[in-house]
């Protein structure tokens, strides 16, 4: 396994862990002028780009993809899109942890699939198995599993108090 590619694949997870466990510090760091969810989204997009570049660095692309690619990628991305559509940026990027009032959502996929955005992301990664070595897909997926576990143990008392 290429060490740099492995580091790139894992890069966002320490950031997500730190935000989840130190929400008030992040809110304070962002200050009154910057929305903590928006700043998190921007940083996350940069980290996601690094993850994707890491995968491309070890990938062997070929066309056409295997048949399993299409349903896994399509449904995985549908779940990601749907979660973002229902929760918005603040709901997707830890808004509740940062002291925002995010309404509870019960529409599909919530209430049917536990952690639908993580499930969708893992499905999308699995779709790429014909191009990317298994160990990188596994490593990235384990990062999501770690975050699902961490977020399932949420302590509401650890939520940040909004400074706005």
Swiss-Prot record:
Family listed: Belongs to the class VI-like SAM-binding methyltransferase superfamily. PEMT/PEM2 methyltransferase family.
Enzyme Commission number(s) from the entry: 2.1.1.71
Main location, first listed in the record: endoplasmic reticulum
Organism: Arabidopsis thaliana (Mouse-ear cress)
Biological role: Catalyzes the second two steps of the methylation pathway of phosphatidylcholine biosynthesis, the SAM-dependent methylation of phosphatidylmonomethylethanolamine (PMME) to phosphatidyldimethylethanolamine (PDME) and of PDME to phosphatidylcholine (PC).
Matching InterPro entries: PEMT/MFAP, Phopholipid_MeTrfase
UniProt entry tagged with the keyword Ligase: no
Protein name per Swiss-Prot or TrEMBL: Phosphatidyl-N-methylethanolamine N-methyltransferase
GO cellular component terms, A-Z: endoplasmic reticulum membrane; intracellular membrane-bounded organelle
Entries under Pfam families matching the protein: PEMT (PF04191)
Membrane topology, from the record: Multi-pass membrane protein
Superkingdom field: Eukaryota
GO molecular function term, any single one: phosphatidyl-N-methylethanolamine N-methyltransferase activity
